[in-house]
Amino acid sequence: MKEILITNDDGYESEGLKKLVKMLKKEFKAKITIVAPASEKSACSHSITLTKPLRFVKVGKRFYKLDDGTPADCVYLAFHALYKTRLPDLVISGINKGANVGEDITYSGTCAGAMEAALQGISAIALSQFYKKSEKELDYKNALKITKKIIQNIFDKDFPLEKKEFLNINFPAKSKIKGIKICKAGKRVYNFEAHSNINPRGVEYYWLAAANLDFEDEKNSDIVLLKKGYATITPIMLDLTAYERMKKVKKWLKANNE
């Protein structure tokens, strides 16, 4: 029997997590374990907790919340504490409320859950549902349908990537999708904001916020295709080396030392 570990960054009570688990239990004969943060950890990136102890709190059968833990903590500790004989066959992080595209992947706790699994040699996918502010309720129907197909492919044909790589998958907001595209990550134009205020004791504080989600208009990028109504799949590798720049840096260093 296949074993699946599920995590997310929206917290153990999120709708996307519930929908995903329900579909998996219905469609796959697999042993499913859920370890999710006790509270929302959006944009926590690949942080792990080293300054205080963490504890599992049982929510249900093979379902735990990690008290103040991050998605990376959830995967790391699940591997070490819950899997005594062998690690899971697949780790799924999501389904996130909101897209994780372009350089936002580096901020994403959802992607970090998959990333932690990939670092430890386990096949992993990150799932995110794009939505518009006008939507009162998210429709996960297409996301679940595509996720089912992808997982079936993984179990039938093996994982398509090498070690320390994972699949970042985003689903469009439209009810009728145009199809699935394999594509590169786009380039974000960042417009962060910081809103200041004064607390009752006269101390200034700030709320960080992202402004408009602007991206460069690249023909085959995840964000452009997502907005056009395609589900996007981007293979992500954890080797961050800019190989094409190595010779340039070498020449630059040599020139500065002459």
From Swiss-Prot:
As one GO molecular function, the record gives: nucleotide binding
Localisation per UniProt entry: Cytoplasm
Task: Kindly list the cofactors needed.
Answer: a divalent metal cation
* One Pfam family matching this protein: SurE
Q: Which GO terms describe its cellular component?
A: cytoplasm
Keywords attached to this entry: Cytoplasm, Hydrolase, Metal-binding, Nucleotide-binding
Q: Key word Cytoplasm present in the record?
A: yes
**Annotated binding of a divalent metal cation, by residue:** D9, D10, S42, N96
Does Nucleotide-binding show up as a keyword for this record? yes
Enzymatic reactions:
a ribonucleoside 5'-phosphate + H2O = a ribonucleoside + phosphate
What EC designation does it have? 3.1.3.5
What is its EC class? hydrolase
> What does the function comment of this entry state?
Nucleotidase that shows phosphatase activity on nucleoside 5'-monophosphates.
NCBIfam families, per database record: PRK00346.1-4, PRK00346.2-4, surE
* Protein name per UniProt: 5'-nucleotidase SurE
Q: Which organism is it from?
A: Campylobacter jejuni subsp. doylei (strain ATCC BAA-1458 / RM4099 / 269.97)
